[in-house]
């Protein structure tokens, strides 16, 4: 029986490349001359810390980072940025988290969405991924299109497609 897995992962090497590219772009920008700023990627906690001298500049740096992530194939919705920007001394910073895995509430929404579609497929939650099996390859492709089209707040990848 054909099957595939629905996962939500961010390639940390590509994220590191995007952070380096964003840092390189900011170095050459006139509006960031003589401004203290930094991008720090923490592999262990999967966070990106953006630091600058004002909250407006932090928002500009986040926009640059999102653009560079998108160029490297990482969707902007995989970056979870908190609303409040922290002020500490003369610097402002925000610690954005990269979404890895699918939360259980989102998993349940996806499984319910698949079951409500009345397609002849089964969906099973396995850890932080969802395995979808069915008799028809067309049904599985319909599920892929439905998950891509559903507004669930994070990007999904499809792996291990087997016939």
From Swiss-Prot:
Name the Gene3D superfamilies for this protein.
Answer: 3.30.70.860, YajQ-like, domain 2
* UniProt keyword list: Nucleotide-binding
Could you confirm whether the keyword Phosphoprotein appears in this record? no
Origin organism of this chain?
Shigella flexneri
CDD domains found in the cross-reference section: YajQ_like
Q: Name one Pfam family in it.
A: DUF520
Q: What does this protein do?
A: Nucleotide-binding protein.
Q: Which InterPro entries match?
A: DUF520 (IPR007551), UPF0234-like_C (IPR035571), UPF0234_N (IPR035570), YajQ-like_sf (IPR036183)
Q: What GO molecular function terms would the record report?
A: nucleotide binding
Please indicate if the UniProt record lists Nucleotide-binding as a keyword.
yes
Similarity annotation: Belongs to the YajQ family.
Q: What is this protein called?
A: Nucleotide-binding protein YajQ
Q: Which GO terms describe its cellular component?
A: cytosol
- What domain of life does the native source organism fall in? Bacteria
């Amino acid at each position: 029986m054909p099957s595939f897995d629905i996962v939500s992962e961010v390639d940390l090497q590509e994220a590191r490349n995007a952070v380096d590219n964003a840092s390189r772009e900011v170095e050459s920008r006139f509006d960031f001359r003589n401004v203290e700023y930094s991008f720090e990627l923490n592999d262990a906690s999967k966070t990106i810390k953006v630091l600058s001298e004002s909250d407006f500049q932090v928002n500009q740096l986040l926009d640059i980072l999102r653009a560079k992530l998108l160029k490297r194939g990482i969707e902007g919705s995989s970056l979870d940025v908190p609303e409040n920007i922290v002020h500490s001394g003369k610097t402002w910073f925000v610690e954005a988290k990269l979404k890895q895995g699918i939360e259980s509430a989102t998993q349940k929404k996806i499984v319910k969405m698949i079951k409500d579609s009345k397609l002849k497929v089964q969906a099973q939650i396995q850890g932080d991924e969802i395995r979808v099996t069915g008799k028809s390859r067309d049904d599985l492709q319909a599920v892929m299109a439905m998950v891509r089209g559903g507004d669930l707040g994070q990007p999904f990848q499809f792996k291990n497609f087997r016939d």
